[in-house]
């Protein structure tokens, strides 16, 4: 960790970056650190406890609009960065990405393609526990599945913590804030909560990198990640595309191919 701190201090002192986004110790686990001065860089940590996806801050202009930014990235953050780059949300010359390998050595990536190459050795995989939960849900009848999710949605208070924590929810104006017309009702009720989550999952189709930030952020413990990760598996099975990699062919939901399957049309 000392090598990472030394690297960050050097970057700040030499003026290579204006801000370093990383992790520090908090009162209840780790929390984001926004480091602009070298004298607080010794608060940086990067270990297995750093599970929240701090790549969410890379699309915040109030943080990144003042100059070059560095980020100390975990694997989920690296996948997010590649996905955001694919969606033209990041500028390569405005971002410096750091990581730490298994030997504690600091990796400074030269660009998004290098991150993409690095991630090839760490393919995106759903945990065995989540796979079992998804399989259990898929074995249910449609009516049983609907009853299960309506039960979960009845807990939702529409705080939008899932949206705030997701690094790929970066719309300047979310559909739930549009009131002309009112696509989704603003109050919390099982059916309108379900409308919101179905909309969110569809927007994540082919994009979710499986970081679990939505589940972690939910104060009611709703397993929202099972929706997006199940969709992620379906996209991989049907289109052969995994998110968190530079897909030159285009986004699966905005790209048409003449040979696309049409057997779902009745």
Residue ranges and their predicted role:
Residues 154-174:
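Extended mid-to-C-terminal alpha-helical interaction segments
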């Amino acid at each position: 960790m000392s090598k990472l701190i030394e690297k960050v201090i050097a970057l700040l002192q030499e003026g290579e970056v204006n801000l370093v986004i990383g992790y520090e110790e908090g009162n209840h686990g780790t929390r984001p650190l926004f480091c602009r001065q070298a004298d607080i860089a010794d608060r940086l940590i990067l270990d297995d406890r750093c599970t929240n996806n701090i790549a969410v801050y890379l699309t915040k202009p109030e943080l990144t609009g003042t100059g070059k930014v560095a980020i100390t990235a975990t694997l989920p953050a690296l996948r997010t960065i590649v996905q955001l780059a694919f969606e033209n949300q990041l500028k390569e010359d405005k971002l410096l990405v750091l990581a730490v390998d298994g030997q504690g050595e600091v990796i400074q990536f030269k660009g998004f393609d290098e991150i993409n190459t690095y991630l090839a050795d760490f393919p995106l995989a759903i945990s065995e526990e989540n796979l079992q939960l998804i399989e259990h849900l898929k074995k249910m009848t449609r009516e049983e599945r609907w009853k299960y999710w309506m039960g979960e949605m009845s807990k939702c208070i529409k705080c939008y913590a899932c949206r705030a924590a997701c690094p790929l929810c970066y719309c300047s104006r979310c559909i739930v804030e549009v009131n002309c017309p009112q696509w989704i009702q603003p109050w919390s009720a099982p059916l309108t909560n379900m409308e919101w989550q179905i909309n969110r999952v569809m927007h994540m189709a082919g994009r979710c990198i499986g970081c679990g930030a939505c589940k972690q952020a939910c104060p009611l413990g709703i397993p929202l990640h099972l929706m997006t990760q199940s969709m992620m598996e379906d996209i991989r099975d049907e289109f052969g595309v995994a998110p968190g990699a530079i897909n030159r062919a285009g986004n699966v939901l905005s790209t048409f191919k003449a040979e696309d399957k049409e057997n779902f049309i009745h």
